[in-house]
């Protein structure tokens, strides 16, 4: 039976990869809705190729422009805009599968709406779990939704875990791999001077700018540890991070009997996307087969928490519980945006997040409103902290 998809964040890198897989299997997948923030030109091109029922953008001006171009091309795709429109296409009867690929906190509400509508959710938006893990997982369970991880690491863990939850007691730990990003071997003393372009040059993966910076700080790996905790129900002491520069082993599961299962593949997001789209079947993803003889060498090392303080901050937030993870994510989004805008140094990202967490009044969220309130408070605190920092290249007077 053909699956009907709502693709949240279709113009980003995950969206591109998802549509590439969809195009290879038109007999299996059809598109109900595509969404973008402001990249109207790309969204129009996608709509003309995949003919969704609905296209959603962030604002009225972009919506008017997209609708005019679609009508001129003879397209019948309806155009909507705004946060509620994202929620509407996520819970629509017109789709059975929602690919949640909006970057950041903006993806929380539509992802949660999909869970409450009992959809099959392909989760690439890790912030939904980082911000509101218990609330989100309760919604998945209570409404009979199916949650399939798309992040390469969590998809790898999912593939290596037993399907029967009763057998999860045999797991000793899960090991989340990380490339180490572009600054794995760079002298820590020079990190303050790195540029946004340098931070966005990932050695193995093609990603958007925000997640590329998160990879460079290893905040991305910290967020993935938090996500793994909620997805697989393991405490932080049973989740390890391992640097693996080649990005061939995407993660591992270690069992109590000494067995270790790993998922390997070329670093291409179409592999985990295809796995989740077709699960429990397998389909061609357009990815070349892995040639281990050509790679020849796989190496591993422990993470350097002094070099990557954001990783330590994320693990601390997980262990603190409450709204700490939501505050961590919010502060990081503000700090990364400031870095990409060249308003702060690369090293100030961790400084900002640390300062916000130090000033946090932590509490257990009673519901989504508490999470949203903590997110907003952390954004205000991060913005205030950044406002007191010297601009890059400007030092405070002695």
UniProtKB/Swiss-Prot annotation:
InterPro entries: DXP_reductoisomerase, DXP_reductoisomerase_C, DXP_reductoisomerase_N, DXPR_C, DXPR_C_sf, NAD(P)-bd_dom_sf. Gene3D superfamilies: 1.10.1740.10, NAD(P)-binding Rossmann-like Domain (3.40.50.720). Mn(2+) binds at residues 151, 153, 224. It is an enzyme of class 1 (oxidoreductase). Keywords: Isoprene biosynthesis, Manganese, Metal-binding, NADP, Oxidoreductase. 1-deoxy-D-xylulose 5-phosphate binds at residues 126, 152-153, 179, 202, 215, 220-221, 224. Its cofactor is Mg(2+); Mn(2+). Pfam families: DXP_redisom_C, DXP_reductoisom, DXPR_C. GO terms for biological process: isopentenyl diphosphate biosynthetic process, methylerythritol 4-phosphate pathway involved in terpenoid biosynthetic process. It catalyses: 2-C-methyl-D-erythritol 4-phosphate + NADP(+) = 1-deoxy-D-xylulose 5-phosphate + NADPH + H(+). Pathway: Isoprenoid biosynthesis; isopentenyl diphosphate biosynthesis via DXP pathway; isopentenyl diphosphate from 1-deoxy-D-xylulose 5-phosphate: step 1/6. Its EC number is 1.1.1.267. NADPH binds at residues 11-14, 38-39, 125, 127, 208. One of its GO terms (molecular function) is manganese ion binding. Belongs to the DXR family. Catalyzes the NADPH-dependent rearrangement and reduction of 1-deoxy-D-xylulose-5-phosphate (DXP) to 2-C-methyl-D-erythritol 4-phosphate (MEP). This is 1-deoxy-D-xylulose 5-phosphate reductoisomerase. It comes from Burkholderia mallei (strain ATCC 23344).
């Amino acid at each position: 039976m053909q699956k009907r998809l709502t693709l949240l964040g279709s113009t980003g890198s995950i969206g591109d990869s998802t549509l590439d897989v969809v195009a290879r299997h038109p007999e299996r997948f059809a598109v109900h809705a595509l969404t973008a923030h402001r990249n109207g030109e790309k969204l129009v091109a996608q709509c003309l190729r995949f003919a969704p029922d609905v296209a959603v953008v962030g604002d009225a001006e972009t919506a008017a422009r997209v609708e005019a171009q679609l009508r001129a091309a003879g397209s019948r795709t309806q155009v909507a805009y705004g946060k509620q429109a994202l929620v509407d296409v996520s819970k629509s009867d017109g789709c059975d599968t929602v690919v949640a690929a909006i970057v950041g906190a903006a993806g929380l509400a539509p992802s949660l709406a999909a869970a409450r509508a009992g959809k099959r959710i392909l989760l690439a938006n890790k912030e939904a779990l980082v911000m509101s893990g218990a609330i989100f997982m309760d919604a998945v369970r209570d409404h009979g939704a199916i949650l399939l991880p798309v992040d390469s690491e969590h998809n790898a863990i999912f593939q290596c875990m037993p399907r029967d939850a009763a057998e999860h007691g045999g797991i000793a730990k899960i090991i989340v791999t990380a490339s180490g990003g572009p600054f794995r071997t760079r002298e820590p003393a020079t990190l303050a001077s790195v540029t946004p372009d340098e931070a966005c040059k990932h050695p193995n993966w093609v990603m958007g700018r925000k997640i590329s910076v998160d990879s460079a700080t290893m905040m991305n790996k910290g967020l993935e540890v938090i996500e793994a905790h909620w997805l697989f129900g393991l405490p932080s002491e049973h989740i390890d991070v391992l640097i693996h520069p080649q990005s061939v082993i995407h993660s591992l599961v270690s069992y109590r009997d000494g067995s270790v299962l790993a998922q390997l593949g070329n670093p291409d997001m179409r592999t985990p996307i295809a796995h989740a789209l077709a699960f429990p079947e397998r389909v061609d993803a357009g990815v070349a087969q892995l040639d281990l003889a050509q790679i020849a060498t796989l190496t591993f090392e422990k993470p350097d928490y002094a070099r990557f303080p954001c990783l330590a901050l994320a693990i601390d937030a997980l262990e603190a519980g409450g709204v700490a993870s939501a505050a961590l994510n919010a502060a990081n989004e503000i700090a990364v945006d400031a870095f990409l805008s060249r308003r702060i140094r690369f090293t100030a990202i961790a400084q900002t997040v640390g300062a916000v967490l130090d000033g946090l009044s932590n509490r257990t969220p009673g519901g989504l409103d508490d999470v949203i309130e903590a997110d907003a408070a952390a954004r205000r605190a991060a913005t205030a902290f950044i406002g007191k920092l010297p601009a890059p290249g400007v030092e405070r007077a002695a």
